[in-house]
Amino acid sequence: MSNLCRNIKVFFKVFLYRFKQNKLNQAAGYLTYSTTLALVPLIMVFFSVFAAFPVFNEITGELKQFIFTNFAPSTGDAVGEYIDQFVNNSKQMSAVGIISLIVVALMLIHSIDRTLNSIWLDTSVRPAIFSFAIYWLILTLGPIVIATSIGISTYVTKFATYTFEQDFGLSVGIKLLSLMPFFLTWFIFTVLYMVVPNKKVSIIHSAAGALIAAVFFTLGKQAFTWYITTFPSYQLIYGAMATLPIMLLWIQLSWTAVLLGAQLSAVLADIRSLDCGNIQIEKIKEEK
């Protein structure tokens, strides 16, 4: 029991130190700014990739619903209309303009890469060509992986709903439907924490950090939606511009949840090093 209390104390001690050291609040604000600039270019690239694969036509609407519901709660319809309009306008752009949008989207991926690697205290730098190749793969294959995951989750949910309602007359399928976005979010965060850092990250540590991030993300979404629907005073202040600050605030909260999960994964590796005697807590504090 004493060892458990000691381990918990050491964990929170290291976690709080790393939180301050990595300045996660500032990092979340930086990523919020980068995301705001790259939101339209990123979505334009995503749906352009979908358009190149007719097999994804049936789930494009479901993908939009997933994005707007999870990343713009309570304002999804308004944000969706704006983004659809921006994407349609981008189709009329010249080649130079399209390349500029792609560059902005790649810069966001670079910002995420650099921020997550700083959490793992990895200062190594990849060759520029290698980094560009990875970012380009993420930008092009990422939409396919996400669309496939959403398509599979939708199929499993529909199958479970039909099976349980036919065999048992229960609403278990509906409950599964409500849980699928959470498990999909957990899966995406786990892959993010495993793939992005230059260091090798244990799948257990990645899944643990991703679980906490998914829980905070889901609970934060529900709490945020409840607040802005229960206390709509912001609409009186901002009027027609209310959607913008709401979206910015939610992006900030979302990145905070993602970075907290990443920090947890990194700290678990630190704790393991402490347990194995490979590193001392004084050495952790000396790292910059």
Swiss-Prot record:
Localization per Swiss-Prot or TrEMBL: Cell inner membrane
**Keyword Membrane in record:** yes
Main localization of the protein described in the UniProt heading: membrane
How does the protein's chain sit in the membrane according to the entry? Multi-pass membrane protein
Q: Sorted alphabetically, which InterPro entries does this protein's record hold?
A: UPF0761_bac (IPR023679), Virul_fac_BrkB (IPR017039)
UniProt keyword terms in alphabetical order? Cell inner membrane, Cell membrane, Membrane, Transmembrane, Transmembrane helix
What sections of the protein cross the membrane?
36-56, 92-112, 127-147, 176-196, 200-220, 240-260
- Which Pfam families does this UniProt record tie to the protein? Virul_fac_BrkB
Give the family, as the similarity comment puts it: Belongs to the UPF0761 family.
NCBIfam families in the record: PRK01637.1 (NF002457), yihY_not_rbn (TIGR00765)
Listed HAMAP family: UPF0761
Under what name is this protein listed?
UPF0761 membrane protein HS_0693
Where does this protein come from, organism-wise?
A: Histophilus somni (strain 129Pt)
